[in-house]
A protein has these predicted regions:
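Transmembrane-helix boundary motif in ABC transporter permease subunits
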Residues: 22-25, 71-106, 119
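Glycine-rich helix-loop "coupling/hinge" segments at transmembrane-helix boundaries
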Residues: 110, 121-125, 136, 152, ...
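Generic hydrophobic transmembrane alpha-helix motif, especially the helices
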Residues: 47, 51, 57, 83, ...
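C-terminal transmembrane helix and the adjacent membrane-cytosol boundary/short C-terminal tail
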Residues: 129, 138-139, 185-195, 234-269
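Periplasmic/extracellular loop-to-transmembrane helix junction in inner-membrane transport proteins
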Residues: 1-3, 28-76, 222-241
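Membrane-embedded alpha-helices of multi-pass transport/permease systems
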Residues: 21, 81-86, 97, 131, ...
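N-terminal signal-anchor/first transmembrane alpha helix
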Residues: 1-28, 105
Length: 269
Protein backbone atom coordinates (compact mmCIF):
# COMPACT_ATOMS: atom_id res chain seq x y z
CA UNK A 1 0.00 0.00 0.00
CA UNK A 2 1.29 3.47 -0.88
CA UNK A 3 2.63 5.97 1.64
CA UNK A 4 -0.21 8.33 0.76
CA UNK A 5 -2.68 5.68 1.90
CA UNK A 6 -1.01 5.49 5.32
CA UNK A 7 -1.08 9.28 5.51
CA UNK A 8 -4.77 9.13 4.66
CA UNK A 9 -5.44 6.57 7.40
CA UNK A 10 -3.55 8.72 9.91
CA UNK A 11 -5.45 11.90 9.05
CA UNK A 12 -8.81 10.13 8.96
CA UNK A 13 -8.01 8.48 12.29
CA UNK A 14 -7.30 11.86 13.88
CA UNK A 15 -10.63 13.25 12.70
CA UNK A 16 -12.48 10.13 13.86
CA UNK A 17 -10.89 10.42 17.30
CA UNK A 18 -11.77 14.12 17.37
CA UNK A 19 -15.37 13.29 16.52
CA UNK A 20 -15.64 10.59 19.18
CA UNK A 21 -13.99 12.58 21.95
CA UNK A 22 -15.22 16.02 20.90
CA UNK A 23 -16.80 16.85 24.30
CA UNK A 24 -13.44 16.21 25.98
CA UNK A 25 -11.26 17.89 23.35
CA UNK A 26 -13.28 21.05 22.79
CA UNK A 27 -12.20 23.80 25.14
CA UNK A 28 -15.42 25.87 24.94
CA UNK A 29 -19.13 25.48 24.40
CA UNK A 30 -19.63 25.63 20.62
CA UNK A 31 -22.65 27.95 20.96
CA UNK A 32 -21.30 30.18 23.75
CA UNK A 33 -20.98 33.77 22.53
CA UNK A 34 -18.59 36.44 23.75
CA UNK A 35 -19.07 39.59 21.69
CA UNK A 36 -16.14 41.25 23.45
CA UNK A 37 -13.86 38.63 21.84
CA UNK A 38 -15.05 38.86 18.23
CA UNK A 39 -12.55 37.93 15.50
CA UNK A 40 -9.65 37.35 17.87
CA UNK A 41 -6.76 35.62 16.11
CA UNK A 42 -5.20 32.35 17.30
CA UNK A 43 -3.91 32.62 20.86
CA UNK A 44 -2.98 30.28 23.69
CA UNK A 45 -6.54 30.65 24.98
CA UNK A 46 -8.27 30.26 21.62
CA UNK A 47 -6.08 28.02 19.48
CA UNK A 48 -7.92 28.75 16.21
CA UNK A 49 -9.16 32.19 17.26
CA UNK A 50 -12.81 33.25 17.53
CA UNK A 51 -15.54 34.01 14.98
CA UNK A 52 -17.91 36.93 14.51
CA UNK A 53 -19.90 36.04 17.62
CA UNK A 54 -16.87 35.38 19.80
CA UNK A 55 -17.29 31.60 19.60
CA UNK A 56 -14.19 29.43 19.83
CA UNK A 57 -13.29 28.24 16.32
CA UNK A 58 -11.24 25.25 17.54
CA UNK A 59 -14.18 23.84 19.49
CA UNK A 60 -16.49 24.35 16.54
CA UNK A 61 -14.09 22.65 14.13
CA UNK A 62 -13.78 19.68 16.49
CA UNK A 63 -17.55 19.28 16.81
CA UNK A 64 -17.86 19.89 13.07
CA UNK A 65 -15.86 16.69 12.55
CA UNK A 66 -18.59 14.80 14.40
CA UNK A 67 -21.30 16.23 12.13
CA UNK A 68 -19.37 15.61 8.91
CA UNK A 69 -18.41 12.04 9.80
CA UNK A 70 -21.91 11.21 11.05
CA UNK A 71 -23.32 12.35 7.72
CA UNK A 72 -20.59 10.62 5.72
CA UNK A 73 -20.76 7.26 7.50
CA UNK A 74 -24.57 7.15 7.42
CA UNK A 75 -24.73 8.09 3.74
CA UNK A 76 -22.09 5.53 2.79
CA UNK A 77 -23.70 2.75 4.85
CA UNK A 78 -27.25 3.28 3.56
CA UNK A 79 -26.15 3.90 -0.03
CA UNK A 80 -23.87 0.86 -0.03
CA UNK A 81 -26.54 -1.48 1.34
CA UNK A 82 -29.25 -0.30 -1.05
CA UNK A 83 -26.92 -0.05 -4.04
CA UNK A 84 -25.44 -3.49 -3.38
CA UNK A 85 -28.87 -5.14 -3.30
CA UNK A 86 -30.09 -3.42 -6.47
CA UNK A 87 -26.82 -3.98 -8.34
CA UNK A 88 -26.66 -7.63 -7.31
CA UNK A 89 -30.23 -8.24 -8.50
CA UNK A 90 -29.50 -6.57 -11.84
CA UNK A 91 -26.28 -8.49 -12.42
CA UNK A 92 -27.49 -11.87 -11.20
CA UNK A 93 -30.85 -12.12 -12.95
CA UNK A 94 -29.91 -10.27 -16.13
CA UNK A 95 -32.42 -10.10 -18.96
CA UNK A 96 -35.33 -7.70 -18.55
CA UNK A 97 -34.48 -7.02 -14.90
CA UNK A 98 -30.97 -5.91 -15.81
CA UNK A 99 -32.10 -3.90 -18.81
CA UNK A 100 -34.72 -2.09 -16.75
CA UNK A 101 -32.47 -1.33 -13.78
CA UNK A 102 -29.18 -0.56 -15.51
CA UNK A 103 -30.66 0.80 -18.72
CA UNK A 104 -33.37 3.00 -17.26
CA UNK A 105 -33.26 3.44 -13.49
CA UNK A 106 -29.49 3.92 -13.22
CA UNK A 107 -29.38 6.25 -16.20
CA UNK A 108 -32.21 8.41 -14.89
CA UNK A 109 -30.26 9.11 -11.69
CA UNK A 110 -26.98 9.54 -13.55
CA UNK A 111 -28.54 11.97 -16.02
CA UNK A 112 -28.63 14.68 -13.36
CA UNK A 113 -25.48 16.20 -11.82
CA UNK A 114 -25.33 14.80 -8.30
CA UNK A 115 -24.97 18.06 -6.42
CA UNK A 116 -27.75 19.75 -8.39
CA UNK A 117 -30.09 16.84 -7.67
CA UNK A 118 -29.15 17.02 -3.98
CA UNK A 119 -29.87 20.76 -3.95
CA UNK A 120 -33.29 20.14 -5.49
CA UNK A 121 -34.11 17.38 -3.00
CA UNK A 122 -33.00 19.38 0.03
CA UNK A 123 -34.91 22.42 -1.22
CA UNK A 124 -38.00 20.21 -1.45
CA UNK A 125 -37.50 18.31 1.83
CA UNK A 126 -36.18 21.24 3.87
CA UNK A 127 -32.99 21.78 5.85
CA UNK A 128 -31.84 19.43 8.58
CA UNK A 129 -29.32 16.66 9.10
CA UNK A 130 -31.75 13.79 8.52
CA UNK A 131 -33.14 15.31 5.33
CA UNK A 132 -29.64 16.08 4.09
CA UNK A 133 -28.62 12.46 4.65
CA UNK A 134 -31.72 11.26 2.78
CA UNK A 135 -30.92 13.51 -0.18
CA UNK A 136 -27.30 12.35 -0.35
CA UNK A 137 -28.39 8.70 -0.15
CA UNK A 138 -30.73 9.23 -3.10
CA UNK A 139 -27.85 10.44 -5.27
CA UNK A 140 -25.23 8.10 -3.81
CA UNK A 141 -26.60 4.57 -4.17
CA UNK A 142 -26.25 4.38 -7.96
CA UNK A 143 -22.44 4.29 -7.84
CA UNK A 144 -22.49 1.24 -5.58
CA UNK A 145 -25.16 -0.42 -7.71
CA UNK A 146 -23.11 -0.05 -10.89
CA UNK A 147 -19.97 -1.42 -9.25
CA UNK A 148 -21.82 -4.39 -7.77
CA UNK A 149 -23.62 -5.16 -11.03
CA UNK A 150 -20.31 -5.33 -12.87
CA UNK A 151 -18.78 -7.58 -10.24
CA UNK A 152 -21.76 -9.94 -10.15
CA UNK A 153 -21.76 -10.24 -13.95
CA UNK A 154 -18.13 -11.38 -13.73
CA UNK A 155 -18.30 -13.61 -10.65
CA UNK A 156 -21.49 -15.45 -11.65
CA UNK A 157 -19.56 -17.13 -14.50
CA UNK A 158 -16.87 -18.59 -12.23
CA UNK A 159 -16.63 -22.37 -11.98
CA UNK A 160 -17.59 -22.59 -8.32
CA UNK A 161 -20.81 -20.67 -9.00
CA UNK A 162 -21.67 -22.93 -11.93
CA UNK A 163 -20.92 -25.95 -9.74
CA UNK A 164 -23.23 -24.68 -7.00
CA UNK A 165 -25.96 -24.16 -9.58
CA UNK A 166 -25.44 -27.69 -10.94
CA UNK A 167 -25.77 -29.09 -7.42
CA UNK A 168 -29.21 -27.48 -7.12
CA UNK A 169 -28.42 -24.53 -4.85
CA UNK A 170 -31.13 -21.88 -4.80
CA UNK A 171 -30.61 -18.49 -6.41
CA UNK A 172 -30.56 -16.75 -3.02
CA UNK A 173 -27.96 -19.19 -1.68
CA UNK A 174 -25.77 -18.76 -4.75
CA UNK A 175 -26.09 -14.98 -4.61
CA UNK A 176 -25.45 -14.48 -0.89
CA UNK A 177 -23.07 -17.38 -0.24
CA UNK A 178 -20.97 -17.65 -3.38
CA UNK A 179 -21.22 -14.39 -5.32
CA UNK A 180 -21.51 -11.45 -2.92
CA UNK A 181 -18.59 -12.44 -0.63
CA UNK A 182 -16.35 -12.57 -3.71
CA UNK A 183 -17.65 -9.35 -5.23
CA UNK A 184 -17.37 -6.85 -2.38
CA UNK A 185 -13.73 -5.78 -2.72
CA UNK A 186 -14.42 -2.89 -5.14
CA UNK A 187 -17.18 -1.69 -2.82
CA UNK A 188 -14.59 -1.07 -0.11
CA UNK A 189 -12.79 1.33 -2.44
CA UNK A 190 -16.09 2.87 -3.49
CA UNK A 191 -17.05 3.40 0.16
CA UNK A 192 -13.84 5.25 1.01
CA UNK A 193 -14.24 7.52 -2.00
CA UNK A 194 -17.91 7.88 -1.12
CA UNK A 195 -16.94 9.17 2.32
CA UNK A 196 -14.91 11.93 0.69
CA UNK A 197 -17.81 12.79 -1.59
CA UNK A 198 -20.35 12.80 1.24
CA UNK A 199 -18.23 15.09 3.43
CA UNK A 200 -17.68 17.48 0.55
CA UNK A 201 -21.37 17.43 -0.44
CA UNK A 202 -22.47 18.11 3.13
CA UNK A 203 -20.08 21.04 3.36
CA UNK A 204 -21.21 22.37 -0.03
CA UNK A 205 -24.91 22.19 0.83
CA UNK A 206 -24.33 23.75 4.24
CA UNK A 207 -22.32 26.51 2.56
CA UNK A 208 -25.34 27.20 0.35
CA UNK A 209 -27.65 27.28 3.38
CA UNK A 210 -29.32 23.97 2.48
CA UNK A 211 -27.54 21.68 4.93
CA UNK A 212 -27.09 21.71 8.68
CA UNK A 213 -28.74 24.91 9.99
CA UNK A 214 -26.94 27.23 12.45
CA UNK A 215 -25.90 27.29 15.22
CA UNK A 216 -24.72 23.70 14.63
CA UNK A 217 -20.98 23.86 13.84
CA UNK A 218 -21.02 22.47 10.32
CA UNK A 219 -17.78 23.14 8.48
CA UNK A 220 -19.64 24.36 5.41
CA UNK A 221 -21.74 26.77 7.45
CA UNK A 222 -18.61 28.08 9.18
CA UNK A 223 -16.96 28.77 5.82
CA UNK A 224 -20.06 30.56 4.54
CA UNK A 225 -20.29 32.73 7.65
CA UNK A 226 -16.59 33.63 7.45
CA UNK A 227 -16.07 34.24 3.74
CA UNK A 228 -16.95 37.94 3.76
CA UNK A 229 -14.50 38.58 6.61
CA UNK A 230 -11.62 36.61 5.09
CA UNK A 231 -9.48 39.66 4.31
CA UNK A 232 -9.53 40.90 7.91
CA UNK A 233 -9.89 37.63 9.83
CA UNK A 234 -8.61 34.81 7.60
CA UNK A 235 -8.37 32.34 10.48
CA UNK A 236 -12.17 32.09 10.73
CA UNK A 237 -12.35 30.64 7.21
CA UNK A 238 -8.96 28.96 7.04
CA UNK A 239 -9.39 26.33 9.76
CA UNK A 240 -12.79 24.89 8.78
CA UNK A 241 -11.71 25.03 5.13
CA UNK A 242 -8.53 23.16 6.02
CA UNK A 243 -10.56 20.55 7.91
CA UNK A 244 -12.74 19.94 4.85
CA UNK A 245 -9.72 19.70 2.54
CA UNK A 246 -7.80 17.32 4.81
CA UNK A 247 -10.78 15.03 5.36
CA UNK A 248 -11.57 14.79 1.65
CA UNK A 249 -7.90 14.22 0.77
CA UNK A 250 -7.55 11.58 3.49
CA UNK A 251 -10.40 9.43 2.24
CA UNK A 252 -9.29 9.86 -1.37
CA UNK A 253 -5.80 8.71 -0.40
CA UNK A 254 -7.34 5.73 1.39
CA UNK A 255 -9.45 4.85 -1.63
CA UNK A 256 -6.50 5.02 -4.01
CA UNK A 257 -4.37 2.96 -1.64
CA UNK A 258 -7.04 0.30 -1.20
CA UNK A 259 -7.56 0.09 -4.96
CA UNK A 260 -3.84 -0.52 -5.41
CA UNK A 261 -3.73 -3.06 -2.57
CA UNK A 262 -6.81 -5.04 -3.62
CA UNK A 263 -6.02 -5.08 -7.36
CA UNK A 264 -3.10 -7.41 -8.21
CA UNK A 265 -2.57 -5.61 -11.53
CA UNK A 266 -2.08 -2.32 -9.69
CA UNK A 267 0.32 -3.91 -7.18
CA UNK A 268 2.52 -5.33 -9.93
CA UNK A 269 3.14 -1.90 -11.50
Amino acid sequence: MSKLAYIGFAIAGLFILAAIFAPFIATYDVTAQNLAMRYVGPTAEHWFGTDGLGRDVFSRVVFGARISLEVGITVVFVSAIFGTVIGAIAGFYGGFVDRFLSGYVFNVFLAFPGLLLAIALVAFLGAGQGKLIAALCVIGWVGYARVMRGQVLKVREYDYVLAARALGASNLRILFTHILPNAVQPLIVQASLGMAGAVLSEASLSFLGLGIPPPAPSWGTMVEEARQFFSNSPHVLFFPGLAIALTVLAFNFIGDGLREYLDPKQRSR
